[in-house]
A protein has these predicted regions:
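DNA-contacting surface of Y-family translesion DNA polymerases
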Residues: 1-103
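Acidic, metal-coordinating catalytic segment for phosphate/diphosphate chemistry
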Residues: 78-172
Length: 172
């Protein structure tokens, strides 16, 4: 079969995501799922910043024990690549899904950042509360680039295997 449509080059991705298969070995506690979510968001937010992108939509993907799937999404008021903001959105979505997870079990958790924009095309907001984690994110990104992804990590992720990392195409 041939697709008659022309190939579009130079078009940027509209979303990026990552997921983790959990298997059916044992039930997952909410705390364990939270740690899995932290690892996914941390890795994906770093990838988002490395691509010089920001996102407005966070989508949580789930696969249950019966192999059915569900997604939950939230659109942020402004585009961001801030790890803490994205993690809060992901945690809120996971909290909404917890009753389904408790009754149906879970075999996969994934997170997708959508509605992407170039980071220089977004109007910056003034941080009136003085609390911005942009400096922390930038510093951690530089440490990871220079010394590897396991040089510095969140305390909750210490001693945990984060799964295999697959090579990725550039996020242009």
């Amino acid at each position: 079969n041939r697709d008659p449509r022309r190939v579009e080059v130079g078009r940027r991705r509209r979303s990026m995501g990552t997921q983790r298969a959990l298997g059916r070995r044992r039930p997952r506690s909410p705390e364990t799922l939270d740690v899995d979510l932290i690892a996914l968001v941390d890795r994906l937010a770093r990838r988002l910043r490395n691509a010089h992108r920001v996102c407005r939509t966070v989508t949580l993907r789930l696969r249950f024990d019966d192999l059915s799937r569900a997604t939950r999404s939230h659109t942020l008021p402004e585009a961001t690549a801030d790890t803490v903001t994205l993690l809060h959105a992901g945690r809120a979505l996971l909290a909404i899904a917890m009753p389904d997870i408790a009754t149906r079990g879970i075999t996969l958790i994934g997170i997708t950042f959508g509605n992407l924009f170039a980071d220089d095309a977004v109007q910056l907001a003034l941080p009136f509360d003085g609390a911005s984690s942009e400096a922390i994110d930038t510093t951690l990104d530089r440490v990871h680039e220079r010394f590897g992804s396991s040089a510095v990590t969140r305390g909750v992720l210490l001693g945990r295997h984060q799964g295999l990392q697959v090579p990725l195409l550039p996020d242009r």
